[in-house]
Amino acid sequence: MQIEMTIKGLMVDPITNMPIVILRDKEGQRVLPIWVGIFEANAIALQIENISTPRPMTHDLLRNVIHDLKAAVQKVVVCDLQENTFYALIYLSLNGDTLAIDARPSDAIALALRTRAPIFVEDTVIDHAKTVDFTSEKNDADRLHKWLESLDPDDLGKYKM
């Protein structure tokens, strides 16, 4: 089952210093942190903060190409988690057909923000992510788990990229 999510915030992992996109379901019951690259986090942050750039960035270009081809982004879905790597699909409608295009979640999310498309996560991905150790060191995993558990949901919107 797909669960609609919203971006609750962007944070920096205190252990790896990598950006994390925090997705949360509309009821506030489920949260999914997704580690992303710095450039992708910047693309997401620019859109969240409504900051325009003088020239189109990569995700703006992709949005423009999709629009000019008379296609539309229906939704993006974080659909799988394999070997500590999240996978996503971008669903495009084009000439009455629906295409599912493989993408990194960070790119799919950045595009969804630019096209106002909904973001979904398969419930199995959320369930599986709870059991996966995303860090290589046990101590780091414990520290990260405690840090994520201690987060106040109100703090998530305070961290800007």
Listing of model-derived features with the role each one plays in the protein:
Residues 1-161:
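Divalent-cation
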